[in-house]
Amino acid sequence: MSRKDNEVSLARSIFNILSGTFCSRITGIFREIAMATYFGADPIVAAFWLGFRTVFFLRKILGGLILEQAFIPHFEFLRAQSLDRAAFFFRRFSRLIKGSTIIFTLLIEAVLWVVLQYVEEGTYDMILLTMILLPCGIFLMMYNVNGALLHCENKFFGVGLAPVVVNIIWIFFVIAARHSDPRERIIGLSVALVIGFFFEWLITVPGVWKFLLEAKSPPQEHDSVRALLAPLSLGILTSSIFQLNLLSDICLARYVHEIGPLYLMYSLKIYQLPIHLFGFGVFTVLLPAISRCVQREDHERGLKLMKFVLTLTMSVMIIMTAGLLLLALPGVRVLYEHGLFPQSAVYAIVRVLRGYGASIIPMALAPLVSVLFYAQRQYAVPLFIGIGTALANIVLSLVLGRWVLKDVSGISYATSITAWVQLYFLWYYSSKRLPMYSKLLWESIRRSIKVMGTTMLACMITLGLNILTQTTYVIFLNPLTPLAWPLSSITAQAIAFLSESCIFLAFLFGFAKLLRVEDLINLASFEYWRGQRGLLQRQHVMQDTQN
């Protein structure tokens, strides 16, 4: 077993990947503020988001985690035998993905151009924007291929930081074109994003060239990319189901309300932040290590690593869930309630966001559980579970969104329900295949009860202070007391958000220290993230040494 497959290496790698991704997410927040302030909640903006999501459909299907889970294990296997062999395999794989993406994009462009001749005005704008944005998918795929290689080189920070370029170009254009015609500036923004994604890919090129230059001679044995066809095909099917489910949610949101896609997209940006920033980051680091443990039948090490990441992820996501439910309104105000963005849209986004809140924990844990299947090269079970939950989500979204709640928030509540169902079936079938892991999730949930209780206590104290100080209008959609001072300026909104956040976090970590909740105390320890012992563990060691 490689000595890097331990808790220390996992913690350090997680810290590196989170650091780079965090920077890109921060600029993404400013991007959202700029969009809401200067572009408002207009149907043309909703059409832009629908087109933008369609472009990301290609990237989500072929790129990201799906590409990495197929490419990285095979690439590392080849590199262990010969660096030249791995380098030339990467060249072949890169050319295949690049060529396939270009052909696929041209086919979609041709189909959309034909459809464009026969559609009405509202649909015309959506299709036109999609056609302009489609080349972004080519550069996104090239960026993902390069990123997979750089992850093998342990260069997590730079890959996570590259999207900052896109966000900066996005923000600059939105501000520069704020006085232009709404339709013209949306079209111009689409063109600017194509340029932005080109530069995002360009940033990863030097690191790839540096690796390829190390391969000085052609290998004696040439490896075919056919070895990746099976895992890629099943992974693509799994990702396609998820993306089709997301697109169906957006279409259902349009069916429920004309501006429903905008409410859904803006809430998704916030709700997916902890999942993409932390959950998928942990998955990227965990997959290679667990794969080696399962394949070599070193289940003792595998159990330790899984227990470490499940406990860590559970603790973080419990805090994120509570924070989302508590701070949804002040947070959305800071991000969106500016300029042309109406208060009614803010309230609608908050309702959708709170519906998504219950899905944060299962959405973050599901990829980690899926690692147990991927480590055994078994992709069919997650695929069938994904198909089942996607179909259930579509039906439930229609029932809750259109008939029961009669609101876009019904779609988010349906997502939360089906997310827990998906996690249950993933763990059930993974336990059947690897019985030694069967009790691990339950043990992690049981251990997190103390974290959950402490978090709920901090939430109740924070709510109690709002009631006592008659400031419930900061966090309640239907406040108990009227507005004492206006929250129209970004300064007042930021003060309200930061005040609520600081009060909640102060009580949370204060109670954690008082009640000696180690999993919470460790989260605030830099040494813990460096892979060292937690605070309470070090205290126990010191006491034992003194005795």
From Swiss-Prot:
Transmembrane regions: 32-52, 55-75, 96-116, 122-142, 156-176, 186-206, 227-247, 270-290, 308-328, 355-375, 380-400, 408-428, 457-477, 495-515
Keyword Cell membrane: yes
Classification via Pfam families: MurJ
Membrane disposition: Multi-pass membrane protein
Family to which the UniProt record says this protein belongs: Belongs to the MurJ/MviN family.
Role played: Involved in peptidoglycan biosynthesis. Transports lipid-linked peptidoglycan precursors from the inner to the outer leaflet of the cytoplasmic membrane.
Subcellular location: Cell inner membrane
Native source species: Chlamydia pneumoniae (Chlamydophila pneumoniae)
Record-linked InterPro entries: Membrane_Transporter-Flippase, MurJ
Keyword Transport: yes
Keywords (A to Z) from UniProt: Cell inner membrane, Cell membrane, Cell shape, Cell wall biogenesis/degradation, Membrane, Peptidoglycan synthesis, Transmembrane, Transmembrane helix, Transport
GO biological process: cell wall organization; peptidoglycan biosynthetic process; regulation of cell shape
Chain segments annotated as coiled-coil in the UniProt record: none
Pathway connected to this protein: Cell wall biogenesis; peptidoglycan biosynthesis
The protein's name: Probable lipid II flippase MurJ
GO cellular component assignments: plasma membrane
